[in-house]
Structures are given as C-alpha cells and as structure tokens.
C-alpha cells in the first residue's frame, strides 16, 4: 500500500468486536523498543505523511470494500460504485442487489452490499443526511463508539477510517500487522483484538500512528513475509524476538 492509497482492512470485521479505541492499559509501556523500531522502519521505508483529511463516509465505504481483496481491486470497486451512484443518497435508493452487482469484482459482493445499504439507511435515519463529517470534531473514543454501532463495522474498519479520514491517532491492526507485532514482541503471541488495540494505542508515540501503520505494511510485504521472512536484511531484527532465533 502506498502512503497515498486508501488503507485496507483485509480481514473481515467482526461486528460484535469492541470499539477500536479503548482505555489504555494501567501500566505505562516502555517506549524504547517501539521508538527504535519506528525510527529504523522510517530509515528503511521513508516517513509517510497523512497530510489532509478526507470524507469519513467515503473512507468508511472504501474500507468495507477493501476487505478480503487487493488494494487495486478495492479502488476499482469503489470507483465503479461512485460512478454508478454519484451520491450516497442515490446508493441508498438503489436495490441491494444493484449495489452488489456494481461491486461484484471486489469479492463478497452480497455481504458488502448488505453492510453498505444498512449503514447508509441507519445514518440517514439518525442524522437526516448522509454525512459523517462531524466525526472530524469528535474525541477519538466518542467517534469510535459511534461507528461501532453499525452492523459489520469492526475495530479494524473503525481504526482505518479514523486514522486515514480524520487523522485521528489510533492504530489499525490486521493479520499482517498482527504477525509483525507478535514477531517483534510488542504484543503477546496469544492476544485478542481488544487487548492488542489497548496495547498499541497506548504504546505508539504521538505523531507516529500513521507512519508506523504504513511502514509495517510495507515491511510485511518487503521482508517480514508470512513465510521465509528475510530476517538477515531486516532493519529491526535487533529488537525482534522471532528474528533473533533465526540469525
């Protein structure tokens, strides 16, 4: 994923999961290892910047469409959806089957169409307009609680929406980021989504949420792959529990 492309939440969200932003753990974390890791990832991959806010509802739908597909497919699917329905009110008036047919190329079309249709309907009923720009002004925990009420919207989708659209300092986790964080020892091997979000939202230094998220994705694709990771070339192997067992 490039720094300018929409984020992906490649895992299917669990609508019963807790909000993405929760109270921090009681014990203050040791920031030294994570600061080292962030610094060395930035030396290796650059310092990505999230320079501007974007429309939260657009972003939320993009994240829904990104689940279980590639960045390229999700962008293509979102573009097709916006071309077919220039406004979200037009999408709301459409049949769910028409939405599904429009996003078919992105996979899980029926499931995603149901989530999108339900989301739009509920926002319209509650707010009177299909507009989530008010999320820009809400405290992070309040924005997270609001988004968590929608069916099919879980912690990864919430965190990605708030980080990328609102520039909120919250840390999204997916399978790939979970893998790297477990390897370097920042989260336990057995760790729930809720606990992992607690740990990382408390641990990541202010101003580094976006950079760390994007660079972990880059690192996972370039070196820290699920199989045959290139530990000998890893810029953070010194602090990696897993890597130290292989070199």
Role assignments for model-derived ranges:
Residues 21-247:
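Catalytic cores of DNA base-excision repair glycosylases
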